[in-house]
Amino acid sequence: MAWHSQTWTFFQGEWHEGNPGIMGPRTHAAWLGSSVFDGGRVFDGLMPDIDRHAARVNRSAETLGLNPTMTAEAIIALAREGVKKFSPGTAIYVKPMYWGEADGPSTIMADPDSTQFCLCLFEAAMPPAMGGLSVTKGLYRRPSLETMPTDSKAGCLYPNNARI
């Protein structure tokens, strides 16, 4: 799959087509990793568990010390609105995200009141049904709660997983 497919992003009260710039070089999340996301799917006209994904992104934001700016219900309503921008039958990935924009009391902490939100929806085909699955053990392990915010869907966790 190409890294960029049909995409709609809700940011600062408006829908933007494509991949809009939403962070700058001073954005806390861009250099210190204060970002969270969640990911739901739309397929076959269904949007299963979107309520759980919306609630979890808010919990993840709080875990990272960010102040969520949207209710789960508002995220769900925006997702339903955004899905209408795609052709019927399109498989869509639904990705609500929060991040710290400004430094907080210390440079390494984000200012909770600077929390930004966007909802990104993009075309993403469902993977083909598989006949089986292979697993292996890698050299790296997932960090544990005393070293990383593993009780959240924090963006800072995923580069380590990609090394496996």
What are these regions (language model features)?
Residues 76-104:
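Short, acidic/charged, Gly/Pro-enriched secondary-structure junctions
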Residues 1-69, 77-81, 99, 108-164:
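Helix-start/capping segments and mature chain N-termini
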